[in-house]
Amino acid sequence: MKLRANRVGEQMKKELGDIISRKIKDPRIGFVTVTDVQVSGDLQIAKVYISVLGDEEQKENTLKGLAKAKGFIRSEIGQRIRLRKTPEITFEFDESIGYGHRIDTLLHEINKDGKREE
């Protein structure tokens, strides 16, 4: 069953990216990238991880806009993917990109300090 949940998650990720970028006209929603979709084993719940280009205020506004459009997004997913029941969608920020950027910055600082000591 886990394999099917992964396949549904990947398909939802592709469709959500298209729906958010082309179908939703809410001005609160900025530049959003769907980074991952985790679907439960029974295909009832889908956690959608997103990254947003912008500051904290823009991220919060985007999350509010997506929450407002959740019903529309779910109905679009239901039309595009044939499932008995369309999963309930929740949106969360993907902090891994920020962590990766922070680690990259720290590694560059360490590298600079190492060259100065030589």
Swiss-Prot record:
Please give a single GO biological process term from the UniProt record. maturation of SSU-rRNA
Localization per Swiss-Prot or TrEMBL: Cytoplasm
GO cellular component term of the entry, any = cytosol
Gene3D superfamilies according to UniProt: 3.30.300.20
TM region positions: none
Q: Which UniProt keywords apply?
A: Cytoplasm, Ribosome biogenesis
**Where the protein is mainly located, per its record?**
cytoplasm
The yes or no answer to whether the keyword Cytoplasm is present is yes
Q: Do you know which InterPro entries this protein is assigned to?
A: KH_dom-like_a/b, RbfA, RbfA_dom_sf, Ribosome-bd_factorA_CS
Q: Name one GO molecular function term.
A: ribosomal small subunit binding
Q: Subunit info? A: Monomer. Binds 30S ribosomal subunits, but not 50S ribosomal subunits or 70S ribosomes.
The family database entries (PANTHER family) matched by this protein are listed as: RIBOSOME-BINDING FACTOR A, CHLOROPLASTIC-RELATED (PTHR33515:SF1)
Q: Which family does it belong to?
A: Belongs to the RbfA family.
Q: What is the role of this chain?
A: One of several proteins that assist in the late maturation steps of the functional core of the 30S ribosomal subunit. Associates with free 30S ribosomal subunits (but not with 30S subunits that are part of 70S ribosomes or polysomes). Required for efficient processing of 16S rRNA. May interact with the 5'-terminal helix region of 16S rRNA.
Q: What is this protein called?
A: Ribosome-binding factor A
Q: Encoded by which gene?
A: rbfA
